[in-house]
């Protein structure tokens, strides 16, 4: 079959569509956010492809696999087995890294186990077991007639007089020994000091190097090795300072006897006890109680609560501090930061062995005096954390814990034996820390010889190929040691994509969700080439995408619309880019042809040169002591290639610092910096990201935006409700009273089917309406609470027109383009872009002071050109009210409308971390060293 034929697809908002998709082509599905793209690609095509494959397995095997729900579709023909590559972050397991996900680390373990050279950590000499023949050949290669002696070390750096050993050597017929570097006669050995360490080496043979000595040397080496237990030394007789040759017949260091077991791949695994660092168990980090977190506010006194739980309200611990203050003569009422550093150290870390007189008052008012050392607040917390059985105490103490690199392995996660195995001059931790681009260069240049080259040939081929695939999808800036939980959705998706290319499957249907997220325009071409390569292997590649380059590169485009939600779900246009542009109904076509576009502002908002937010000396991750200046009251875009340090600078440094200072929240961790000034221009900071607005089906836009409370109050105010004594809680489906108890307000019942997918059936008591009959008898303007929750935002806006408090919130949801979502729609069904816009609308509906700092990370994710246009209008409106907007973005339509740009680079990873350009878009476009400028310039010059 040449096509995939879909007949009567009705999943979610799809309107009974019939569609023919060409097989073995690159197909892009595009359309407004919420128009039904994911419903078609993931919930119909992928779900059915996956379901058919799983159903071909035995019932026993099926119970171990998560089955997809059968999509609401009449028929699909021509489907292949389906693989979906989504944006979900890969893993929350701290042991999962880029290297382990891509399986490159497994090949590296094998490589080091087979061709690695173990070394002694103290003497840096290779641990190689040598044969007697190799030892003899080495000695015979020395200059002819060199006067040498062969020594057998019998005592190495051991205390004692060693009388018995010296007598024993002499009894065996040996005449001389080198004791502590001096040649001595064994007939009259020196008396050795009992408490000093000594080294005794027996002189087994003295000789001049000649070619006919081979047999004699072999016998002498045999004697020396037997005497010493496997070690022999060859030294010059006339020059005691000359370098000595040390030989070992064991797999051990000839100097100190350090040895390792036979190298196996598991020795290099931090997930295996054989290879994991014993101190941190292979996690690379250690938890500790952090003084910066414990001292919540150093400007106030200990009595006033500088340390939570140790102030005057907590009598037991406060008594300790007052006794401590009496002993060391400091004032518990003084600001903590004014106390001498020595006193602060004692308070935190304890008094050591020094005993202090503590006065304790018991419940009866009796004073008890006890003398003992003070353990210190940090040690006290660590002990209680370990000993307590109370979860609430443990959770409270955990707020003071931070992570730091393990002191033993330095964050490499491996035990010393594994860290000291080298290929050339490089060990495994060094390779894991390099960027993927640098690692590829290292392995491309690596040349092994002889037997090692033969052993490593296939392993190196696999490593190089996998690294090349990661570089091809624009991930050259990541390192193999990067923890999987720190990856963005786009990065995780591209790693999966690279792994799939490595698998080299043919005849598969790949379904991808916006793989260009987080990618700079510069890297887009490489990503598209990767998708084309997947197609050329003989696969059908279906991509949900809004990126213009991807749409133009597609063999076939499907435009879903015309609107979003209930207004979408139809195929508006399909064909190649030229055919889409000619279709008058296609919104995408209008943007591609230039008939509709996002305009460049006629003039930029004026800069107030006196008002700046200045962050100095930011040095987290790859940032190179960056000084960031953001103009207050403007719309600033932070740009730069993937991995240049944008997220570290804004999300890991600026946002937590501003949050700690302005929002009075729990202290959050921030990356290292020197100083920050200008926060006085703001009264709050808000981070609007794409994380879900709620993780349970009970959470919905009405509850998140605060709409549901006034709606419930309205229903409770209806005369009938007042007559029955119903309060607003009666109209909540989360608490007993008004909800249907058969389904506990869910509206559906879950039926577990074991080796079939779980089935959700409407509750037979409330028929899916979530409330009991009595509650549904209350009507406001003829509608029940269930009917109101089932309204779209647009319908509700009209219905509640006379209630300003509700109408204003609904209007902001419409302003951000969410007129189509239902008030009671489960938040788990919202896309990332929709969740972000619900948050944006919630902020917009609040009374505005004009002094808010808004931070957004790639707000255009999941948004169509038309959605972006609407989003920009909202952001510009916030800016016009005096607020400051900081956006991390790659989308050129957003960048060109910014008032100010901060461009990081020049490259990703270690090649980035610097500010390359700042200024208006027109000023930045002139900077030749900026990759962003190269793509921005032609757009600004377009008529």
Curated annotation (Swiss-Prot):
Domain named ABC transporter: residues: 310-587, 607-937
Residues given in the record as ATP binding sites: 31-38, 640-647
Keywords, ordered alphabetically: ATP-binding, Cytoplasm, DNA damage, DNA excision, DNA repair, DNA-binding, Excision nuclease, Metal-binding, Nucleotide-binding, Repeat, SOS response, Zinc, Zinc-finger
BP GO terms, sorted: nucleotide-excision repair; SOS response
Span of zinc fingers (C4-type): 253-280, 740-766
Localization annotation: Cytoplasm
PROSITE patterns: ABC_TRANSPORTER_1 (PS00211), ABC_TRANSPORTER_2 (PS50893)
Superkingdom as given in the UniProt entry: Bacteria
Cellular component GO terms, alphabetical: cytoplasm; excinuclease repair complex
DNA repair among keywords: yes
InterPro entries hit by this protein: ABC_transporter-like_ATP-bd (IPR003439), ABC_transporter-like_CS (IPR017871), P-loop_NTPase (IPR027417), UvrA (IPR004602), UvrA_DNA-bd (IPR041552), UvrA_inter (IPR041102)
GO MF assignments: ATP binding; ATP hydrolysis activity; DNA binding; excinuclease ABC activity; zinc ion binding
Similarity-based family: Belongs to the ABC transporter superfamily. UvrA family.
Assembly: Forms a heterotetramer with UvrB during the search for lesions.
Role according to the record: The UvrABC repair system catalyzes the recognition and processing of DNA lesions. UvrA is an ATPase and a DNA-binding protein. A damage recognition complex composed of 2 UvrA and 2 UvrB subunits scans DNA for abnormalities. When the presence of a lesion has been verified by UvrB, the UvrA molecules dissociate.
Protein name per the record: UvrABC system protein A
Species this chain originates from: Haemophilus influenzae (strain ATCC 51907 / DSM 11121 / KW20 / Rd)
UniProt gene name: uvrA
């Amino acid at each position: 079959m040449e096509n995939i034929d879909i007949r009567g697809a009705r999943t979610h908002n799809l309107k009974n569509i019939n569609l023919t998709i060409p097989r073995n082509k690159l197909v892009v599905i595009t359309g407004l956010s919420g128009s039904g793209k994911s419903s078609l690609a993931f919930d119909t095509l992928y779900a059915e492809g996956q379901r058919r494959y799983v159903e071909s397995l035995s019932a026993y095997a099926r119970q171990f696999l998560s089955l997809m729900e059968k999509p609401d579709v009449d028929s699909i023909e021509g489907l292949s087995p389906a693989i979906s590559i989504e944006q979900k972050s890969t893993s929350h397991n701290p042991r999962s890294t880029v290297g382990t996900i891509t399986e490159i680390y497994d090949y590296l373990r094998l490589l080091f186990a087979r061709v690695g050279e173990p070394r002694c950590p103290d003497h840096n000499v290779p641990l190689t077991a040598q044969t007697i023949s190799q030892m003899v050949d080495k000695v015979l290669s020395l200059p002819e007639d060199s006067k040498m002696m062969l020594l057998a070390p019998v005592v190495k750096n051991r205390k004692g007089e060693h009388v018995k050993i010296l007598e024993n050597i002499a009894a065996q017929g040996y005449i001389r020994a080198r004791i502590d570097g001096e040649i001595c006669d064994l007939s009259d050995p020196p008396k050795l000091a009992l408490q000093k360490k000594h080294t005794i080496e027996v002189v087994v043979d003295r000789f001049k190097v000649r070619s006919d000595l081979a047999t004699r040397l072999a016998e002498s080496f045999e004697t020396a090795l037997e005497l010493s237990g496997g070690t022999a030394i060859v030294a010059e007789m006339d020059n005691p300072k000359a370098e000595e040759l040390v030989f070992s017949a064991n797999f051990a260091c000839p100097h100190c006897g350090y040895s390792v077991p036979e190298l196996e791949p598991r020795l290099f695994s931090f997930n295996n006890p054989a290879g994991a660092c014993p101190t941190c168990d292979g996690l690379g980090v250690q938890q500790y109680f952090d003084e910066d977190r414990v001292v919540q506010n150093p400007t106030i006194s200990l009595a006033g609560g500088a340390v939570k739980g140790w102030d005057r309200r907590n009598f037991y611990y406060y008594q300790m501090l007052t006794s401590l203050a009496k002993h060391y003569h400091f004032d518990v009422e003084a600001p903590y930061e004014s106390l001498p550093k020595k006193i602060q150290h004692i308070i935190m870390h304890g008094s050591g062995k020094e005993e202090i007189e503590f006065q304790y008052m018991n419940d009866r008012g009796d004073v008890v005096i006890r003398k003992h050392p003070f353990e210190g607040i940090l040690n006290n917390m660590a002990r209680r954390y370990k000993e307590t059985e109370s979860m609430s105490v443990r959770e409270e103490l955990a707020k003071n814990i931070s992570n730091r690199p393990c002191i033993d392995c330095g964050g490499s996660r491996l035990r010393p034996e594994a860290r000291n195995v080298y290929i050339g001059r490089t060990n495994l931790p060094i390779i894991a820390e390099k960027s993927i681009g640098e690692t590829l260069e290292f392995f491309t240049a690596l040349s092994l010889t002889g037997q090692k080259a033969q052993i490593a040939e296939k392993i190196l081929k696999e490593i190089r190929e996998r690294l090349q695939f990661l570089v091809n999808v624009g991930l050259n800036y990541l390192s193999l040691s990067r923890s999987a939980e720190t990856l963005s959705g786009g990065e995780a998706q591209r790693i999966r994509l690279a792994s799939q290319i490595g698998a080299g499957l043919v005849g598969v249907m790949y379904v991808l969700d916006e793989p260009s997220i987080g990618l700079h325009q510069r890297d887009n071409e490489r990503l598209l080439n990767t998708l084309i390569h997947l197609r050329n292997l003989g696969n059908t590649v279906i991509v949900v995408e809004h990126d213009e380059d991807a749409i133009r590169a597609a063999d076939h485009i499907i435009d879903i619309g015309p609107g979003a939600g209930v207004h979408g779900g139809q195929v508006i246009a399909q064909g190649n880019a030229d055919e889409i542009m000619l279709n008058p109904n296609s919104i995408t076509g209008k943007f591609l042809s230039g008939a509709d576009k996002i305009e460049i502002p006629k003039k930029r908002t004026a800069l107030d040169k006196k008002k700046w937010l200045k962050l100095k000396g930011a040095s987290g991750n790859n940032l190179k002591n960056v000084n960031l200046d953001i103009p207050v009251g403007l719309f600033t875009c932070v740009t730069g290639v993937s991995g240049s340090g944008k997220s570290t600078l804004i999300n890991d440094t600026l946002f937590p610092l501003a949050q700690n200072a302005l929002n009075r929240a729990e202290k959050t961790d921030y990356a290292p910096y020197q100083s920050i000034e200008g926060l006085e221009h703001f009264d709050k900071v808000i981070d609007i990201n794409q994380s879900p607005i709620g993780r349970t089906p009970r959470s919905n836009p009405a509850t998140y935006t605060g709409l549901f409370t006034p709606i419930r109050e309205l229903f409770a105010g209806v005369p009938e409700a007042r007559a029955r004594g119903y309060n607003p809680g009666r109209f909540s489906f989360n608490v007993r009273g008004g909800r249907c108890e058969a389904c506990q307000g869910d509206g559906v019942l879950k039926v577990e089917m074991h080796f079939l997918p779980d089935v959700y059936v409407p509750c037979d008591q409330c028929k899916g309406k979530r409330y009991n009959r009595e509650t549904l008898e209350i009507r406001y303007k003829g509608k029940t609470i269930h009917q109101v929750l089932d309204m779209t935002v647009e319908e509700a806006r009209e219905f509640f027109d006379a209630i300003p408090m509700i109408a204003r919130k609904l209007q902001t949801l419409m302003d951000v383009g969410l007129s189509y979502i239902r008030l009671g729609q489960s938040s788990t069904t919202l896309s990332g872009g929709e969740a972000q816009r619900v948050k944006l609308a919630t902020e917009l509906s609040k009374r505005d002071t004009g002094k808010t700092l808004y931070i957004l990370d790639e707000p255009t994710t999941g948004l169509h050109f038309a959605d972006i246009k609407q989003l920009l209008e909202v952001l510009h409106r916030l800016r016009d009210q005096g607020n400051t907007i900081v956006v991390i973005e790659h989308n050129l339509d957003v960048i060109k409308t910014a008032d100010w740009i901060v461009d990081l680079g020049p490259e990703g990873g270690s090649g980035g971390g610097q500010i390359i350009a700042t200024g208006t878009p027109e000023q930045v476009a002139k900077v030749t060293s900026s990759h962003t400028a190269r793509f921005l310039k032609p757009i600004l010059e377009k008529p």
